[in-house]
């Protein structure tokens, strides 16, 4: 099974990707995690990616397509995968299609801008594992085994940067949505909008019902 999760920053894609991964034993391919890992390397390419991320711009299509395509095609994903944060543009979507990997489900996570900013203000990351946490929407029990002082704010979670990313997302999502709605007409792909205002648990239940053909 091949699942794609798209949506703006802070809409819960990463959280649901991890939950679905545990439930269905599918590996997560997270563009954000991959790029942040590259950005920590003391290389010219690592510095380039770091500067792009910190500026709030999207990594150019030519670069991100190459990175994700290599990841998808050159590693062992025989049982499928969960693709978190790719594609973000129509060019990326077409390139994913050209890999001839049959995407089964596309979930678009939708959340009002005001709530996106509220969530991002309380979002932290474990710099070692790359796991993202939210102290407001996640239960304390999920964080009790962590030393909170080891968690850090993401460098790209500053207000001006998020504003830029949201503008880019709003510009691209219209075409991306049309692309997958059209694909749904001609292929077995199924496209669903997910209301991210619901709790983590309820969002997860909704997605699982769709995957298990109960909705």
UniProtKB/Swiss-Prot annotation:
Stretches the record annotates as NMP: 30-59
Localization annotation: Cytoplasm
Predominant location category: cytoplasm
Classification via InterPro entries: Adenyl_kin_sub, Adenylat/UMP-CMP_kin, Adenylat_kinase_CS, P-loop_NTPase
Domain of life: Bacteria
Function: Catalyzes the reversible transfer of the terminal phosphate group between ATP and AMP. Plays an important role in cellular energy homeostasis and in adenine nucleotide metabolism.
Protein name as it appears in the record: Adenylate kinase
Organism: Buchnera aphidicola subsp. Baizongia pistaciae (strain Bp)
């Amino acid at each position: 099974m091949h699942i794609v999760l798209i949506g703006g920053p802070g809409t819960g894609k990463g959280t649901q990707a991890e939950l679905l991964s545990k439930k269905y034993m599918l590996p997560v391919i997270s563009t954000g995690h991959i790029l942040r890992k590259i950005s920590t390397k003391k290389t010219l390419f690592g510095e380039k990616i770091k500067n792009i991320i910190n500026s709030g711009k999207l990594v150019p299509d030519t670069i991100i397509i190459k990175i994700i395509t290599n990841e998808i095609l050159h590693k062992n994903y025989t049982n499928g995968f969960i693709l978190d944060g790719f594609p973000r543009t129509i060019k990326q979507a077409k390139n994913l299609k050209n890999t001839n990997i049959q995407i089964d489900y596309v979930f678009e996570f939708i959340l009002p801008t005001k709530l996106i900013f509220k969530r991002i203000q309380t979002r932290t990351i474990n710099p070692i594992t790359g796991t993202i946490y939210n102290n407001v929407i996640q239960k304390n029990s999920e964080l009790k085994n962590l030393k909170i002082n080891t968690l850090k704010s993401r460098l790209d979670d500053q207000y001006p940067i998020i504003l830029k990313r949201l503008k880019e997302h709003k510009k691209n999502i219209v075409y991306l949505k049309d692309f997958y709605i059209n694909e749904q007409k001609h292929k077995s792909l199924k496209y669903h909008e997910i209301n991210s205002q619901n709790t983590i648990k309820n969002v997860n239940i909704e997605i699982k019902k769709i995957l298990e053909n109960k909705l």
